[in-house]
Amino acid sequence: MSGPQQISILGATGSIGLSTLDVVARHPALYQVFALTGFSRLDELLALCIRHTPQYAVVPDQVVARKLQDDLAAAGLDTRVLVGEGGLCEVAADPRVDAVMAAIVGAAGLRPTLAAVEAGKKVLLANKEALVMSGALFMQAVRQNGAVLLPIDSEHNAIFQCLPGDFARGLGAVGVRRIMLTASGGPFRETPLEQLHNVTPEQACAHPVWSMGRKISVDSATMMNKGLELIEACWLFDARPDQVEVVIHPQSVIHSLVDYVDGSVLAQLGNPDMRTPIANALAWPARVDSGVAPLDLFRIGQLDFQAPDEERFPCLRLARQAAEAGGSAPAMLNAANEVAVAAFLDGRIRYLEIAGIIEEVLDHEPVTAVEGLEAVFAADAKARLLAGQWFERHGR
C-alpha cells in the first residue's frame, strides 16, 4: 500500500468517531480521512470537515446537505456532500477506501456496515447492533468477500488480543474454555433496588467510568449493552452463549479475559479510553501510539470482581435468552430496546419499564428463522410495532 490509508468514519460526531479522529490526527503519514458522516450534530460535522478535509461528507437529508455544501464552499473546501443511507453505503464501499470505522449507533448502521463488508474492506466494528441483528448473515458476508473484521468494543478487542491468531479454527481447537466479558456495572450497581423506580435519564447517562453517548449510557446502566456484547461475542468468536460469562469489574481496567483449558487466563488491561482499541484495530497487526496514558497499577491498587444480579439487571437475562433462542430473537431484542430507551430518554416511561417492554415484545412473538436481510428488517419492524402498541395501551 502506498500513501496513507484512506478511512471512512461512519458516525464521526459520536464519541467513537471523535476518538477515531484523535488517533488518526496523530499519524498523518499513516491515515487520511476519506469521508465523515453525521446525523444530528451538523455544526460539529462542519467543524470536523474543516479540520480534516475529507473528500466526502454524508448527512441525512437534502436540506441539510445544501446548507453543509454551501458552508464547506465558503470555507474553501471541495468536500462533496452525499445524502442518506445511499450516501453512507457509497462512502463505505468506495474502491479508494482502505478501512471503515462503523460507529453509527443502532439498527441504522447495519446496511452501510454490510456495504463495507461486501466491498471487502477492513471494517472496524463499533456498531454492535449490526452483528446482533444479522449474525450469521453478517459473518457469512465477511467470509465470502474477504473482509477483515476488527472489533472496537473494548471488551471484544480485548478478547481478540487474548486469543491466538488462528482462533477461527474454533475455540475448542485452540484450547479456549470460556470467554469472560467484563462490565463496570454502570451507575446503579449498588443503588438500592427500591430507588431504581425514580431513576432519571440524567442519572442513567452519568456513567462512572466511560464517556459515551446517551443511548449507550442507558444500555450500560441496564446492562443491555453487555447483553448485546454477549451476542456479538458469540458471532465474532464462534462461541456458544454458555461459553461467554459476564463479570462485573467496577474499575474497568481489565477489559476482558480468555480462560484456557490448561488453567491459564489471559487478560488485556489498560486505562478506560476507547482510543486504545481504536488504535489497535487501525494499526493491526502493528501498533501505534493512541495518546492514552500508561496504566499505573500502583495508583489503581485494587481490582474487584462480582457476579451480575439478574434481579437488578433483567436486560442481561433477556439478552442471554435471545442469544440462546437465535433466529429473529436478537433483532427483536435490539429493536424493542432501542424504542424503550428512546422513550425513557424522552421522559415517557420509567427506567424499570425498559426491561418490561422488551420482555413483552419477546414473549408476544415466536422466534422465526432469519434467511435474509429482509427477514432481519421484518423482525426489527415487528418489534418496533409491538413496542409502540405497549405505549398505546398504557397511554404513553
From Swiss-Prot:
GO BP annotations listed: isopentenyl diphosphate biosynthetic process, methylerythritol 4-phosphate pathway involved in terpenoid biosynthetic process
Required cofactor names: Mg(2+); Mn(2+)
Binding, 1-deoxy-D-xylulose 5-phosphate: 128, 154-155, 184, 207, 220, 225-226, 229
Family: Belongs to the DXR family.
InterPro entries on file: DXP_reductoisomerase, DXP_reductoisomerase_C, DXP_reductoisomerase_N, DXPR_C, DXPR_C_sf, NAD(P)-bd_dom_sf
Record-listed NADPH binding positions: 13-16, 127, 129, 213
Pathway per the UniProt entry: Isoprenoid biosynthesis; isopentenyl diphosphate biosynthesis via DXP pathway; isopentenyl diphosphate from 1-deoxy-D-xylulose 5-phosphate: step 1/6
First-level EC class: oxidoreductase
EC number: 1.1.1.267
Task performed by this protein: Catalyzes the NADPH-dependent rearrangement and reduction of 1-deoxy-D-xylulose-5-phosphate (DXP) to 2-C-methyl-D-erythritol 4-phosphate (MEP).
Keyword annotations from UniProtKB, A to Z: Isoprene biosynthesis, Manganese, Metal-binding, NADP, Oxidoreductase
Residues annotated for Mn(2+) binding in this entry: 153, 155, 229
Keyword Endoplasmic reticulum: no
The protein, known as: 1-deoxy-D-xylulose 5-phosphate reductoisomerase
Disulphide-bonded residues: none
The keyword Metal-binding is annotated on this UniProt entry: yes
SUPFAM superfamilies to which the protein is assigned, alphabetical: 1-deoxy-D-xylulose-5-phosphate reductoisomerase, C-terminal domain, Glyceraldehyde-3-phosphate dehydrogenase-like, C-terminal domain, NAD(P)-binding Rossmann-fold domains
PANTHER family registered for this protein in UniProt: 1-DEOXY-D-XYLULOSE 5-PHOSPHATE REDUCTOISOMERASE, 1-DEOXY-D-XYLULOSE 5-PHOSPHATE REDUCTOISOMERASE, CHLOROPLASTIC
Source organism superkingdom: Bacteria
GO molecular function: 1-deoxy-D-xylulose-5-phosphate reductoisomerase activity; manganese ion binding; NADPH binding
HAMAP family named among the record's database cross-references: DXP_reductoisom (MF_00183)
Catalytic activity line of the entry: 2-C-methyl-D-erythritol 4-phosphate + NADP(+) = 1-deoxy-D-xylulose 5-phosphate + NADPH + H(+)
